[in-house]
């Protein structure tokens, strides 16, 4: 049987995060697939290539940037927006967002592919208007800043930002709703995201949790658990590191904050001597912290959340709010505990109670690590390949 011709569509490769890791696994699932993204930076391109190369051989090709090495491995097709992104300094991509939907609708997909798989955050589903082939959307989340007013206010950073996001949000909602009926199938990265797809798009979704590179994170029984809790991740408002700080203060514990971001300065103003900020750190430092901490704190609502799975792979329990992706990953009493989701005061009080009485010896690190293994990339590739094959007919 001839292998299907697959196109993969992503909104931008300007950094490497969880959604880019998903695309890397898509490429491993369908070797030779063409990859399209309106905005591609050199850093984003190289990070994707490195991630794919870690699992297969083949040199990259970057179409539209400088070096055309077609046929040698990965073919990434970008657009004029890459050059515009570089011209404005290669940093923020937000000024270019209004141009992304139209660019996606004009992708050269017609009559070239048997199935198109899009990696969607806000606009990728616009690719349905560029092809008659079945389009399957892997949804990291419908655009939360477009649909969720509280999230938008939290992330906007002031009235001007809120007004700008409100305008762009109206645009994004219309774009998502226009594309939704044309999708052949929707895959959500968690049950929480599937609920959003149902509520906002009016569509059912199959849940396939994203891959986590747990091979980099393993337990070490020879390392004793120490007397501190860990928050790891980007320091941006929706991650709610502020609640972790307040909960540890209330419980009289110690906290290590690993990560950096625009919210760090504010967090340092509310933290006391109980909190240590280590900034951004390489994997070997993160691994060491996962192995040594009493537990990892997850006070924010994530669409999925990679950090809890990495922590569990190292045998660390996770204390998380009972909402969002944590409902897919944390098993109370076995791999961690839930804090009832509510207002900030309720979350702080609930997490402080868990911290105050927390005993890591109640948990089996080996069992926690085995549970994390269910999110391995190999499991993801098998599941996503099966779902897409059935949906594409």
Question: Where are the regions that the model predicts?
Answer:
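Short hydrophobic beta-strand element within catalytic cores of glycosyltransferases
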Residues: 297, 317-322, 330
